[in-house]
């Protein structure tokens, strides 16, 4: 099986999408003849491997020009991508992407025996109605569609009125390289890893901290507009004393920190049009490293977190529900909490990046 994973963005950026793509591709490259197709740009592969704890090889990456002189364009990228498509040695290759416009280009330019596989993580049309026809065409005509949760696949079927028969769910993955670690859980503070954008749910965490007088230790980028907005908000609400900024951790250090963490890990989130699609990557990372997670009860999240079994759920966007569930968790014994965290750890053993790649390969073999 020959596979080209098309990712038309420069790396590394460190966002969740990139983490998922690089880890998935790396595991796929260990199982089949796979190439990661990237825009041509300076790339320190050793740095990328160190940052993401990977072992990507230089000959697994194909660079495609996206820039000529001072002109940078996706059309340039597509022009050179077409050379890969038209190469006769790739006449029966599989082209895999999460990028909507790349998927459209592949469908329009592929050879008869080539296959186009699209991985869906959202409904792009929710943010841009002009994409409706393109997105429907891709979901209808792609040779196979993967979705990162059942809720997303079902919502896309309903939204576009499609069956999407050639499809499967492959949940996001995680690294799980250490044994389960029993912990002495502490409720005096809460660690938070991720974006400092208030609208993504951090605002809910601030309300929770103000109400409970609990300290927050925030791991994230200590610069930029979102950081400054957060700093100003803390000052306005007079809760600066409750928040400690710990800085941005490299991805390989995040896992170490999560293994050592002994606080309840809350995923703050508010309801939006995207609530039926989103499963945060951090959810998998938290659960894979012996933690107790308190997450919003969105349908995609509830596919992973079974309330009271391998984690806990609260009513999304409801500060009162969050506080009540947190207070309930505090009543549990340390032994009971370790049982919950062990269940979380064990449930993630099925969702390693390697197992994700195995599931993808199994489905692709059916169409190859």
What are these regions (language model features)?
Residues 105-106, 136-166, 174-178, 360:
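A short, active-site helix/loop in glycosyltransferases that binds the activated sugar's phosphate group
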Residues 7-14, 27-76, 152-153, 157, ...:
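N-terminal strand-loop element at the rim of the active site
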Residues 220, 228-257:
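Nucleotide-activated donor-binding/catalytic signature segment of Leloir-type glycosyltransferases, i.e.
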Residues 307-308, 312-319, 328-334:
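Conserved acidic donor-binding segment of nucleotide-sugar-dependent glycosyltransferases
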Residues 328, 335-350:
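A short, well-ordered alpha-helix in the C-terminal region of glycosyltransferases
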Residues 23-26, 82-89, 104, 118, ...:
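Membrane-proximal helix-turn-helix segments that form the acceptor-binding/catalytic region
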Residues 4-6, 146, 181-217:
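Conserved donor-binding/catalytic core segment of Leloir-type glycosyltransferases
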Residues 200, 251-285, 295-303:
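Nucleotide-sugar-dependent
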């Amino acid at each position: 099986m020959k596979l080209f994973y098309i990712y038309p963005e420069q790396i590394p950026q460190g966002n969740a999408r990139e983490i998922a793509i690089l880890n998935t591709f790396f595991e796929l490259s260990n199982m089949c003849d796979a190439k990661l197709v990237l825009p041509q740009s300076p790339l320190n592969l050793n740095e990328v491997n160190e940052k993401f704890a990977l072992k990507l090889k230089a000959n697994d990456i194909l660079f495609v020009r996206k820039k000529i002189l001072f002109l940078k364009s996706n059309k340039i990228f597509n022009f050179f991508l077409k050379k890969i498509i038209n190469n006769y040695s790739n006449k029966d290759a599989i082209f895999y992407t999460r990028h909507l416009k790349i998927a459209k280009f592949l469908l329009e330019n592929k050879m008869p025996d080539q296959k186009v596989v699209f991985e869906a993580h959202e409904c792009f049309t929710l943010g841009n109605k002009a994409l409706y026809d393109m997105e429907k065409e891709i979901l209808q005509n792609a040779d196979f569609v993967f979705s990162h949760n059942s809720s997303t696949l079902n919502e896309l079927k309903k939204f576009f009125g499609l069956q999407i028969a050639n499809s499967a769910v492959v949940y996001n993955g995680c690294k799980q390289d250490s044994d389960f670690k029993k912990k002495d859980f502490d409720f005096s503070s809460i660690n938070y890893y991720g974006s400092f954008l208030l609208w993504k749910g951090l605002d809910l965490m601030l309300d929770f901290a103000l109400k409970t007088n609990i300290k927050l230790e925030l791991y994230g980028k200590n610069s930029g507009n979102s950081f400054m907005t957060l700093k100003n908000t803390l000052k306005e609400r007079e809760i600066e004393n409750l928040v400690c900024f710990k800085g941005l951790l490299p991805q390989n250090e995040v896992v170490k920190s999560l293994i050592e963490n002994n606080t309840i890990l809350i995923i703050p989130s508010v309801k939006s049009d995207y609530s039926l699609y989103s499963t945060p990557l951090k959810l998998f990372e938290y659960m894979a490293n012996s933690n107790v997670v308190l997450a919003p009860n969105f349908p995609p999240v509830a596919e992973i977190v079974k309330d009271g079994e391998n984690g806990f759920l609260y009513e999304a966007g409801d500060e009162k529900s969050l506080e009540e569930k947190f207070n309930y968790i505090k009543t549990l014994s340390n032994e009971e909490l370790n049982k919950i965290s062990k269940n979380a750890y064990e449930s993630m053993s099925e969702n390693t990046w390697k197992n994700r790649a195995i599931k993808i390969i199994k489905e692709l073999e059916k169409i190859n």
